[in-house]
């Protein structure tokens, strides 16, 4: 007898799917299972982009000569802290009795990215994959999402945008953090009275930091 596999983004959401299915689910290690279905979960991201030293051990040492770091092909790896759950999900994806995979990660770009990375690392190719897109976690909405699930390929553009955003963030963070740390890290460390100071740069964090600094300056300028 074949079964359907439901993959949620987090355990709490997986529990809601299990309740909505109203099947006699039995608790297993990292998933729930009935005669008809298997429900499992990620714990947020299970896979991440590899640091430069995974491309070349020499890149562990920060140097201006090795910048910019622009790999032709990006490498990915399982996050060590969640390796056990990744292995559980990967094994379920490959189970012979699993006929259809329902992607139930959060309905959005990041949720799509979380699943695609898992499927990529697990090497899933020949399984039927369907996307559950819901606006809430009520029983009615979950069942509607399952009933109206579309082929996962219809979300390829969303996936592509997620991969592109992640690569952009990665390249900006790696290159500018190393560059500014090498150029100004010593000056910042001297000012702070520390031995060494790295300077972190990111698409979001740097903008937010700028907003905080601007707000603090405005506050101090008030007479």
Language-model regions: role of each:
Residues 1-178, 207:
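Intrinsically disordered, low-complexity regulatory segments
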Residues 221-223:
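Conserved small/polar residues in nucleotide/adenosyl-binding loops
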